[in-house]
Every structure is written in structure tokens, then in C-alpha cells.
């Protein structure tokens, strides 16, 4: 009776002027995202297939692919390991200066990439604080692929830490206590109780660090040495083609990077959806 006398009103939209905000959203996506990317794709149509294939498979370009993706993968693996350790320490331990350490984790986010590259070069070059100690032993960390990996580790670590940290904070301590009461060792508790919970977040952080490293330019060019076929990254190849007025070739290589970045974005979104299902978090 009450339901028939007072029919339920449709819920009001959270945002006032929904159609107006939707229009602004579509306009933003069109002007800032879709139109520039569409222009990139259409620019490649000026090339024949042979020209496109020659541009994206030249010896220097292939060498830059190997360095860019290989160094990004290695850096992401290192960040996955040390990012987990840093997140674990920040969540599970209290110590003097913890807030300072927690703030320093985000430093690569705020620091201009050029400043990061110059700082790493000054530190690791042959006349740097660390470089001059290692160079007599035949260890060179700057102006070669090692420098590329180090720069990518520096800029990618926060992605893993900030992805794993909230999952560790929300982990149920009761499960760990129950495992301990049942006779599990600390290692067994970590591998069978804690690790399965944080694996989705760890994979997401790995993918985000990898995606960030693939497109990195500013911090790498200062420490890489930029030697063709040795320490030349793909973004530098694109810049070089633009400086030589080879716009079609630069567009072709950029399209390859765009397709790969889009695939990475799909993988990251899939991992995040898996993480939400795994942890029971709302979508």
C-alpha cells in the first residue's frame, strides 16, 4: 500500500548538469587524446608498407627496441623485488625517520626527469662520487646500458611501492596469527598466506613500472651515453628523426611505441580488475 501511494523516485545524478559535464569530457578526450593520436596514425598512411617496414626495422631502431624493452624489463623486475621490500618495511616496522623515508619514495614522481638524469650522471660517472670508486675495478655504470637500467630503476620504484603498500596495510593479521598458531614458519606464512594476497598488486606495480620505463626519455639521455647500436633508446631515435626532418620515419617508430603502450594499458587494466576481484575491493 505504501509503495503504491509513494512511488520511488529515480535517483538523482551525483553531478549536476550531467549532459554538460559529459559533453566537456568527450570534448577533452577528443582534443587532448583522440585527435593527436589519430593524427599520428593518419600520418603513417603517407608511407607505403615497404617504407613503414624499413623505418621500424632498421638496424639502429631494432637495437633501440632491444635496449628499451630489455632495460625496462630488467628495471621492472628489480623494482618489483625492492619495491616489495620497501613497502614491507614501511607497513610492518616503526623506526625513526619513517615519514621521511615514506616521502622520499615519491621523490621520482616530483623530480624533473632531467634533474634526475643529471644527478645520476654526477654520481655514477667516472669522476662521480660512486663512479670514481668503481672505475678502478673495471665497473662502469654510466654512459652504457647499465646507466639506462639504473635510471629506469630510479623512476620506476614508486609505482611498485605505492601499489603494494595499501594491500599490505589492508591484509588481515588474523590469518598470519592463525598460520603461526598452526605451526607455520615465518617463511611459510609469507609464501602461503601473505604473498598470494599481494601478488596481483605486485604484478600491477611491475606492469606500471615497465610501462613508465618504456617511454622514459629525460632521465636516460644524460646517463646512457646515447651511442648508436649500444646505448640509444627508442625515444631518442624518434627525437633524432625529428631533428633530421624525417617526420614520416619518426611517426612510424612512434606508432610502434603507441601500439605497445596501448597493449600495456590493457594489461594493466586487466591486472587491476583481477586485483579488485582478488581482494574484494569495489570496482
Task: Report each predicted region and the residues it spans.
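Transmembrane-helix boundary motif in ABC transporter permease subunits
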Residues: 5-13, 52, 74-105, 118, ...
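Membrane-interfacial helix termini and adjacent extracytoplasmic/periplasmic loops
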Residues: 5-13, 49-57, 62, 98, ...
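Periplasmic/extracellular loop-to-transmembrane helix junction in inner-membrane transport proteins
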Residues: 7-19, 40-77, 92-93, 241-248
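Transmembrane alpha-helices
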Residues: 23-28, 77, 103, 107, ...
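Hydrophobic alpha-helical transmembrane segments of multipass integral membrane proteins
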Residues: 31, 66, 70-82, 86, ...
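Transmembrane alpha-helices and adjacent helix-loop boundaries
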Residues: 110-117
Amino acid at each position: 500500500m505504501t509503495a503504491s501511494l509513494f512511488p520511488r523516485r529515480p535517483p538523482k545524478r551525483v553531478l549536476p548538469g550531467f549532459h554538460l559535464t559529459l559533453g566537456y569530457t568527450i570534448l577533452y578526450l577528443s582534443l587532448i587524446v583522440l585527435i593527436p593520436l589519430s593524427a599520428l596514425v593518419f600520418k603513417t598512411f603517407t608511407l607505403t608498407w615497404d617504407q613503414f617496414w624499413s623505418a621500424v626495422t632498421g638496424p639502429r631502431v631494432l637495437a633501440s627496441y632491444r635496449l628499451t624493452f630489455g632495460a625496462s624489463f630488467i628495471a621492472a623486475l628489480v623494482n618489483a623485488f625492492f619495491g616489495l621490500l620497501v613497502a614491507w618495511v614501511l607497513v610492518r616496522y616503526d623506526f625513526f625517520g619513517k615519514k621521511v623515508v615514506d616521502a622520499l619514495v615519491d621523490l621520482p614522481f616530483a623530480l624533473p626527469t632531467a634533474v634526475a638524469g643529471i644527478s645520476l650522471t654526477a654520481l655514477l660517472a667516472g669522476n662521480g662520487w660512486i663512479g670514481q670508486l668503481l672505475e678502478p675495478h673495471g665497473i662502469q655504470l654510466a654512459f652504457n646500458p647499465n646507466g639506462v637500467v639504473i635510471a629506469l630503476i630510479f623512476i620506476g620504484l614508486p609505482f611498485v611501492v605505492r601499489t603494494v603498500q595499501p594491500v599490505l596495510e589492508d591484509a588481515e593479521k588474523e590469518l598470519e596469527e592463525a598460520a603461526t598458531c598452526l605451526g607455520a614458519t615465518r617463511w611459510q606464512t609469507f609464501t602461503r598466506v601473505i604473498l598470494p594476497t599481494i601478488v596481483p598488486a605486485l604484478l600491477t606495480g611491475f606492469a606500471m613500472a615497465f610501462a613508465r620505463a618504456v617511454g622514459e626519455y629525460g632521465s636516460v639521455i644524460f646517463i646512457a651515453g646515447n651511442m648508436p647500436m649500444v646505448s640509444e633508446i627508442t625515444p631518442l631515435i624518434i627525437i633524432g628523426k625529428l631533428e633530421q626532418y624525417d617526420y614520416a620515419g619518426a611517426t612510424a617508430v612512434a606508432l610502434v611505441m603507441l601500439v605497445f603502450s596501448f597493449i600495456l594499458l590493457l594489461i594493466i587494466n586487466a591486472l587491476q580488475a583481477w586485483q579488485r576481484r582478488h581482494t574484494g575491493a569495489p570496482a
